[in-house]
Structure formats: structure tokens, C-alpha cells
Amino acid sequence: PVRVLLLESGEPCNMAYFAPVQLAPEKEDAASASVWRDGSALRAENPRCPYKDVRVTLRCSAPWVSAGTDARFLCGEDSGALRRGFPALAGAFRLEKEAVMLLGTADVPALLDIARAREALAKTKAWWAQRVRGEKYSAAMPESVRRLAPWSAYAALCCRVLGRGSLYQSGGAVGFRDQLQDRINLLPVDAAGARAHILACCAHQYAEGDVQHWYHPTGGEIDKGVRTDCSDDLLWLPWAVCEYVRATADESLCAETAPYLTSPPLARGEHSRYETPSLSGETGTVLDHCHRAAALVLRRGIGEHRLLRMGGGDWNDGFDAMGESAESVWLTWFASGVFHDFS
């Protein structure tokens, strides 16, 4: 992908652009990134990036005034707190009237042409207008809701689904429960996307029934993710299947197949493990995947108050240290609703 910025000014001016570079899962890994000038472009890469051959490029159609490769570009050479380890794509440019700036992992210098950039913007707007057009929403909705719905769908698709981010976190991982909720909420505009995502989630379930709480798609056969004893995430799979079938009447999804993952089960006292699992050699229908999720919830049992156990946290991740005896009112409600719909 590439971000295209169309810049305009009523009079000539200097402008600066600054983008810190991480390109890795952890902030500490940013120190391994390298940034260099390559002709009319700035490029950056990080050997700690989990994706192969990823390189970010910054270009601008306006003349370069200066370029920088770290935070000293903004804060000065004498800033003791900003030594090597804070790499950045940074540049100052002379904007006469209008210009195009490109930043992304795709290097498309042809878009520096202002006419082409405007054409790309028009095509992008048309694509989104078709994707989230208002007539996809129920006429029974209040007019104000129908007017806002396309914008909400646009924001959810861009941020949550494509960007895998949020206001509070931009980790780039796929949250098992989070994106199932996002995809189901977007059924009016992208039922096919919801179907495909349900199948992808099935492929991130362990043979025992639990799931990767979140994972980083790598484009390979198996994604690296975290195995947890979270009590609710696996239940969002049968919930999503029920919601999808109810909305689309497409029961064929239930007969689709997907593999199971395998790894050593979490040891007693081990609440999570970041790992690359293996394929178990087993496959099952979507219906089977849902059955295994429900069965594991029941096997985990109930507590003193006959409520389902909290485990490593329910929908509220902040309850991850409540202990083995903790019970969850919310989880019991949710499971009851899912089991009722699934039956």
C-alpha cells in the first residue's frame, strides 16, 4: 500500500514531513531500523520486521530542501535524548503551489504526477462510495442513522479491518474476537468478507478448541500468535457463524472445512504463550470448529456460584489475573445466548 498526499498552498512555502520508523512488533526493535537517501527518495527497512522484504519509501514531487534519517531532524543535533535508535523518514520541501507526497511499502513514482494522483483519488472515492453506499442499509432505519452508517462502515473497514488498528492500539495483529465482531457488524456492506474471515478464524483454532487470541498474518501457511486461557474468545466463532447464517441464509458455510493447529498445551500457571504452532493434520467443518469451541467452554467448568470460570479473562481483558476460582457473570450470559442460537 501507499499513502498519497495531495498538498496545496496559496503561496510558496517550506514544509516538513516527519515519520518515525519502527517496522517491527516492539518499540525497542526500532533501533534496528535503517534509513537512507536514495536519489530523490528516502527509504527505510528493519531486519526485525516479521514480513519479508518490506521497505518503506518516502517521495515528494516538490524539490527537497533537506533530508534526515532520525529525530535530530526536528529536535536538533544537540538533543541528548534523541541519539541513534530513533530512526525516521524526514524531509523538508519547497512547495510552490501544489505537490504530491508518497509514503508506503509500494514505490509508485508515477503517482508523483499531480494529474495521475488526482485521478487515483477520484477512483478511490468511487470505489469506497460503491462499497459503503447508503442503499445497503435498511429503509426502516432513521434517516440520520442511514446517513451516518456509510461513514461508520468506511471508518471500520479502513481502521479495524484493513489497518488492524484503533484509537488506543495499532499493533497490526488480528484480534480473534475483535475482528469477528467487526466483520459481522459490516455484513450489510461486505458479507463475502465476513464469510472469508470466519474461515480464516477456523484455521487459527487449536485441536483442543481454544484459539489464537491474536495473530500476525505473515502470508504463509501458519501465523505466529498468542495462545491463551482466555475464556470468551473462542465463543465468538459460533456467535459469528450464527449471525452470518441469520443475515445471509448461506448455510453452506457450515460445511466448509479448515485445519486445526497444534502445540503443547499451556502448562498450569502458564496463561499465555507467543508462538508459531504447527498444523495438527486434522481438518474439520466450520460446524465442527464451533462444536469444539463450545465443548471446551463446558469442559472448563463452573465455579462455586455455578457460573462459568473467568480463566485468563473474559471480554474484559483487565480481568486476566483474577485467579482460577474467579467466575464471570458476563461470560455465562454470553455463552447461554450463543448456545441457544447455535442449537
Which residues fall in each region the model found?
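Residue-level detector of short, conserved catalytic/binding motifs and their immediate flanks
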Residues: 2-5, 180, 233-235
